Regions:
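Secretory targeting signatures
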Residues: 1-24
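Flexible "stalk/tail and boundary" regions
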Residues: 23-316
Length: 316
């Protein structure tokens, strides 16, 4: 009998310490039932490549990973294997310098867009960190920003920027010429309280995690309201400060649910699919996960801001 209890105890312990996180899957057709923790980035612990406060994260077509580190005001680039490649940026207001680089996006040409939050501008770079252009000044007018937060690029190269404090989304050409904007502060359709990010799906529809309203809103490419979902809470499809949205190749939508310390996945129409993560500093746990991206192979990278790392997951 004692042997049986020992076997059972060992089995329970193996479940507790497994790196595979079983998720609650309500759509069998989604084929997403669990996510396996792979590793943290960076794995090396040197001052040159240490991440202090990761916020923005994205991947390019070759699988290279770009991380905004607001703790050092620089951008770090890693290979698809997580090996450090290069970094650029420092504190300041000149070209290629930053004051809280919050969001990032890599377009189909490999250009990197950074929302330089406290410099009230967007900067555009080549993939090696070479400065290309910038736009934006402080203010509330067209092409001006108070706190530019998220950035996204559609299939035509148009650039969308969410402005947290102006409570709007602005649309620009690839070189920063203003096209249109929408949004105001409030809780109605098409209104926002701190729009934290902006993302586009394969049809170029626009999605905004409405951080202060604990919901996600969906729009046409020119800002016409389509739908919304989410309420405050801890249940499936509920949020506590949804931060960043990313899409995979199947147009499934991944949302970092910051104060719930988890990631939720939805269809692009807002149907809940699955979730994973809980509060903590262990593998597969999060402390206010800020940003997320999915590469062409379905690998999921989460910028775990307070834990000062990036975590890589694969779906089973």
């Amino acid at each position: 009998m004692q042997f049986v209890f020992i076997v059972i105890a060992l089995f329970v312990l193996s479940l507790m310490f497994s790196s595979t996180y079983v998720t609650e899957d309500v759509l069998s057709s989604s084929s997403l039932s669990s996510f396996t923790f792979v590793k943290k980035i960076p794995q090396e612990d040197t001052s040159e490549i240490q991440i202090f406060e990761p916020e923005g994260i994205d991947v390019d077509s070759e699988g290279n990973i770009y991380v905004n580190d607001i703790g050092t005001n620089r951008i770090l680039k890693f290979s698809k294997n997580g090996t450090y490649v290069l970094s650029w940026g420092s504190t300041g207001s000149g070209n290629g310098k930053f004051n809280h680089p919050h969001g990032n996006e890599v377009d189909s040409q490999g250009n990197v867009y950074i929302t330089d939050q406290d410099n009230q501008r967007v900067q555009k770079f080549k993939s090696n960190g070479t400065f290309i252009t910038k736009w934006g000044t402080p203010g509330t007018g067209n092409g001006q920003f108070m706190h530019p937060h998220g950035v996204a690029v559609d299939s035509k190269g148009n650039v969308f920027v969410s402005d947290r404090d102006n409570a709007n989304i602005q649309k620009f050409t690839t070189d920063g010429k203003f096209i249109t904007k929408w949004g105001s502060e409030g809780s109605g359709d098409g209104q926002f309280i701190q729009p934290w990010d902006v993302a586009v799906d394969s049809d170029d529809n626009v999605y905004v995690p409405d951080y202060g309203n604990n919901r996600t809103q969906k729009f046409t490419n020119n800002g016409e309201f389509i739908a919304k979902w989410g309420t405050e809470g801890e249940g499936n499809g509920q949020f506590k400060q949804p931060a960043v949205i990313a899409f995979d190749s199947a147009d499934r939508m991944y949302v970092t649910d910051s104060e719930n310390h988890r990631v939720q996945i939805f269809s692009k129409n807002g149907t809940f699919i699955t979730k994973w993560g809980n509060e903590g500093s262990g593998d597969g746990q999060f402390l206010k996960p800020e940003s997320i991206t999915v590469d062409s192979l379905g690998h999921v990278y989460v910028a775990d801001t307070v834990n000062n790392n990036v975590q890589l997951f694969i779906s089973n």
